[in-house]
């Protein structure tokens, strides 16, 4: 019998903090774990139209929460991005720190990619005005403006919070549909699509909405719904079979039939409340960065002051230890695990990412003390 157990401790994994299940969601795991568990009372052939459990009502609540007109649930944020991009032809402009799945979705959809540059080391910031410059460049080179623009609200590498509203305004000025990837923002901080001028919002339930994986959220403005949510026109030439309610960009019916959707629903009341506490999370991460940078050589990359709880550090002092240690880069993971801290990628010392979202002040203090203790053990200077 194969038995796999996860390590225990304070989890600072950069892609897991916002997906930690609520008590209500965790209690439902066994009851809803079997296959297509939400489909007992499916009469319309689509998961988003099921009324028992109240998925139809829930998607309307999520649309209101995001300030958008309609919502679908998808097999992760990557599926949501593909559903949008597959409805366009030509070119897409995206930020140069976009997640790899944004590029893959574009490639699979036959879209040519143009990147908006960032400022490089050490802040890696994206200037919203550069979207206009790239739009003009695309027209100059192809004869047409881009079909679509994508902005990663908070990038997965440095945790920079980009100016979505300004990019949305620029997209409106040019008449280019705007896709906002909120995988690391919606669900942990307030996101209002109408205020941000977004035509599409993509979210990640397992990254930021306290749900099991995989589940994404696709929110759409009404003027784009017919384009992206178009239904099947196929009819079998011999059988005459047709599937007129099936939305083709969502594979007819999104594969989110059990725990992903149920946990998303059960965690939603908590999500509604926790986005109101974002300022406290920012207060925590700014204190955390100040304390971590008391370790010799430790430096947070990305924008300052910090506006998100995901942080990448460069740590040349730990890397020097790793070069001489018998465990090489794994020594840091080992030392943290001994002190009850998990989630740092094994083998990483030159740079590493972590996320302290929703940790208590006491837990954050323990993380800081663990790093300082390791530094002192190996002769790295730590400020008082």
Regions found by a protein language model. Name each.
Residues 2, 283-380:
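Conserved C-terminal alpha-helix-loop-beta "cap" of PLP-dependent enzymes
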Residues 90-146:
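PLP-dependent aminotransferase-like
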Residues 124-182, 186-187:
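Active-site phosphate-binding strand-loop segment of PLP-dependent enzymes
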Residues 14, 25-86, 97:
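Conserved N-terminal alpha-helix of the aminotransferase class I/II PLP-enzyme fold
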Residues 76-80, 99-100, 121-124, 183-188:
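Short acidic loop-to-helix transition motifs that present clustered carboxylates
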Residues 205-307:
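Active-site C-terminal subdomain of aminotransferase-like
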Residues 113, 178-179, 300, 343:
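Hydrophobic beta-strand scaffold residues
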Residues 192-206:
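Conserved active-site segment immediately N-terminal to the catalytic lysine
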């Amino acid at each position: 019998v194969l038995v796999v157990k996860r390590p225990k401790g304070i989890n600072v994994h950069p892609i897991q903090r916002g997906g930690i299940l609520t008590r209500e969601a965790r209690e439902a795991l066994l009851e809803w774990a079997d296959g297509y568990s939400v489909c007992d009372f499916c009469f319309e052939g689509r998961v988003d139209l099921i009324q028992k459990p109240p998925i139809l009502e829930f998607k309307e609540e999520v649309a209101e929460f995001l300030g958008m007109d309609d919502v679908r649930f998808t097999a992760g944020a990557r599926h949501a991005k593909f559903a949008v991009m597959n409805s366009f032809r030509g070119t897409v402009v995206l930020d140069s720190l976009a997640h790899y799945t944004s590029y893959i979705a574009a490639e699979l959809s036959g879209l040519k990619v143009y990147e908006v540059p960032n400022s490089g080391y050490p802040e890696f910031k994206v200037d919203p005005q550069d979207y206009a410059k790239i739009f003009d460049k695309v027209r100059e080179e192809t004869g047409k403006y881009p079909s679509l623009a994508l902005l990663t609200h908070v990038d997965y590498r440095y945790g920079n919070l980009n100016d979505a509203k300004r990019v949305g305004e620029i997209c409106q000025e040019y008449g280019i549909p705007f896709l906002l990837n909120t995988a690391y923002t919606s669900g942990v901080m307030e996101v209002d699509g109408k205020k941000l001028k977004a035509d599409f919002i993509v979210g990640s339930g397992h990254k930021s909405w306290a749900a099991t994986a995989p589940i994404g959220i696709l929110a759409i403005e009404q003027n784009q719904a017919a384009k992206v949510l178009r239904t099947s026109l196929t009819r079998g030439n011999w059988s005459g079979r047709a599937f007129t309610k099936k939305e083709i960009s969502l594979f007819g019916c999104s594969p989110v039939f059990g725990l992903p959707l149920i946990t998303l629903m059960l965690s939603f009341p908590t999500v509604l409340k926790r986005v109101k506490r974002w300022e406290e999370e920012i207060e925590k991460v700014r204190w955390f960065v100040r304390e971590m940078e008391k370790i010799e050589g430790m430096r947070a990359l990305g924008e300052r002051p910090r506006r998100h709880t995901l942080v990448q550090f460069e740590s040349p002092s730990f890397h020097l230890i790793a070069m001489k240690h018998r465990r090489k880069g794994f020594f840091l993971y080992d030392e943290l695990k001994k002190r009850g801290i998990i989630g740092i990628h094994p083998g990483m010392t030159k740079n590493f990412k972590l996320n302290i979202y929703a940790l208590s002040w006491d837990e954050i203090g323990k993380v800081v003390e663990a790093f300082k203790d390791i530094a002192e053990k190996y002769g790295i200077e730590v400020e008082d």
